[in-house]
């Protein structure tokens, strides 16, 4: 509101939505089409959520003409922001709203993933709850599938309900090409170039579990989401190595069985010969 201190009240009312979108801390929001916000069907149930609902709606739609004191104006302004946020959560899951958020996502307006292995992948705002004043907004990375806190304190104060818990999932269903291929690359702790034993053992176990899961998915002909070329080649190499190891184990087992059978045969033959000699000795005596 400080941006409009020098402006007249009529100018302020005329540019409320423009002012709201351009205000510092509101970069995560997109501009809601006037046709959407003036359609009462899209606002169903919000009158019970917002104080001074009608005045707030009039302010958002630039028809506010109530002559009131500063305290009342500030209260209505706060209600208008809250109402805009609640409508925003509904708008961004529409075709037009998704398109606007897509444009902001391409420009990385929501920030980039701080995880090194994600290579500055764009983030997408999301809520952990659909209930207002419950949890602040978080940022979702589609590459590592994890969520992060906004860097700016202004953004961290935004209500997560203004984006909702379903938006980011709907977004990537509508734009499936934006879902990055899963990478098997991971950080391996080292000391002077050598892998840390405990961490290395954990990584080997995790890799074996992941590879086993991918083999099961491949047998079931289910898309795993991992890169195909190099990863499938790795799996094929692993399968070949396992087959070779199994063949070697079978050969060793067969050799052990044959050796055991030979030893048993030799022992039986030796026992027969010993018995014959003993019988011959008794006869001579």
Curated annotation (Swiss-Prot):
It comes from the Eukaryota. Residues 226-285 are annotated as: Disordered. Keywords: Phosphoprotein. Coiled coil: none annotated. Residues 229-259 have a biased composition (Acidic residues). Signal peptide: none annotated. Belongs to the casein kinase 2 subunit beta family. PANTHER family: CASEIN KINASE II SUBUNIT BETA. Tetramer composed of two alpha chains, one beta chain and one beta' chain. Regulatory subunit of casein kinase II/CK2. As part of the kinase complex regulates the basal catalytic activity of the alpha subunit a constitutively active serine/threonine-protein kinase that phosphorylates a large number of substrates containing acidic residues C-terminal to the phosphorylated serine or threonine. This is Casein kinase II subunit beta-2. It comes from Neurospora crassa (strain ATCC 24698 / 74-OR23-1A / CBS 708.71 / DSM 1257 / FGSC 987).
